[in-house]
Amino acid sequence: MHFKLIIAFVEDRSTDAVMQAAREAGATGCTVINNARGEGIEENKTFFGLTLSSQRDVVLLLVEEHLSRHILEHIGEVGEFDAKPGTGIAIMIDVEDAVGIVHQAQELEEILEENL
């Protein structure tokens, strides 16, 4: 079984919706890292000219490769990543190997058999 890691940088108010969307699309769980900060091309400024950095959450999803594209696209739609600037981004990278997921592998095999 091969895995991908989806890393989503999400506005903190959208984290729960993105997590639910990932589960609906086939993810079996996730890890959330709270209070990340970042900015895009343009800095967010307040009316006093100060820089305003919005809080983000980092959502990590270790998913089976055959489900990965669908999960990535679904969280992008729900999070409105392409529709509104600054709402978030998600990337997907290959995972060479993983340990500690034997209990999820059996469940994933059943999900894959149903969906493929």
Give residue ranges: language-model regions:
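Positively charged, small/polar-rich N-terminal and surface patches that mediate targeting and assembly
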Residues: 1-116
